[in-house]
Amino acid sequence: KNGSADECGELCFALPSDYKFNPDSKSNFEVFLMIEVIKHLIATRDNIGFGYYLEKESGFSSRTAFNGAMLVGMGDYEKEQQTMILDGAELSFLELLPLRPMELNFRKAHSAVELLNLFKEKLVMITPFISTRDDVCNVVAKM
């Protein structure tokens, strides 16, 4: 978002194929996370794109340790394959990557690419989202 009506974004959040949504449950962490992120993105005046991150100090849920999120490209596709022109506007496809506290702190001090490289080095998949996944910064030495 840079004030231009010529840019739009599509936010994706890949869930496991066996994910069970219960509309009557308040424990649908993934749904509430997405709602919180969307509310933040609508309200912010910051430029939103690859690597954009946000923090929710109280966390997104008492059931999880995730207190941040970062927007990343979808898969290992080239940038040109993650955008398209639709009715004269550029549409960018971004994926939501929930972050644990140490990952968020790492992102604050480093680039999005450096954090994504940690995921690769530690062999931790970012899609589909698994709420019990390892914290990629858990064993990173302090810099």
Model-derived regions, located:
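Acidic, proline/glycine-rich low-complexity IDRs
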Residues: 4-7, 11-143
